[in-house]
């Protein structure tokens, strides 16, 4: 997985070169400057749901699982998530390994009213400006692919643009980095980067390392209402659920089951 992460980052660098040929950073900033910048941070507020805050993911494929679904009506999937009571939607925009697209995010943002997370491998401020233009309410910042200076810069930029940020971690060292840069939302990826195994106990053990005022998100490996209940009992605030929902034939019923037990 660590080698895969390097490959994804390398491909993201190639994507950025092409993106900047089509639209420079200055042109992108100019377009964003025409947007209204609200600082009400709807994504962060959505995760404060006192019941169960579910971030439902729109994901066609992944490096570990390959193609997850062939019938990929992303707009209908997003609408189904919203109707079921999802707190927010995560949209993969990485095209090579996850078969995501910026178009998916833009079009979903035009069709739903709940906040959207741009889930990608952000390594350049360009991608944060781009997320704002596409209609995202939040971005994912992955500690393991950024140095602390980049992480702080990107976190501050996101907030300046009215975007929330999930700062994604995998271990105690990364948790400390996230808290040191002032992350308000910390995510824990339960997938082991070395061997692909998934264990929600990772979230539970790391939750104890941060204060209760930090919004804590568990990512990967959440499959049942029992998983959700166990995490909730351990003061986890939100649950990012992708593959389990994408493979479900009745996404609405599954979300209702996860939310209501």
Give residue spans per PLM region.
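N-terminal active-site wall of soluble small-molecule enzyme domains
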Residues: 58, 65-166, 172-177, 203-206
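Glycine-rich phosphate-binding active-site loops on the catalytic face of alpha/beta enzymes
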Residues: 133-150, 187-196, 236-254
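Catalytic cores of alpha/beta
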Residues: 123-134, 172-181, 218, 222-241
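C-terminal helical cap(s) of enzyme catalytic domains, especially alpha/beta-barrels
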Residues: 205-209, 232, 247-261
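An N-cap/entry alpha-helix motif that binds or orients negatively charged groups
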Residues: 3-69
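Active-site beta-loop-alpha junctions enriched in small/polar residues
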Residues: 11, 59-61, 94, 121, ...
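Conserved, mostly hydrophobic/aromatic
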Residues: 8, 56, 81, 131, ...
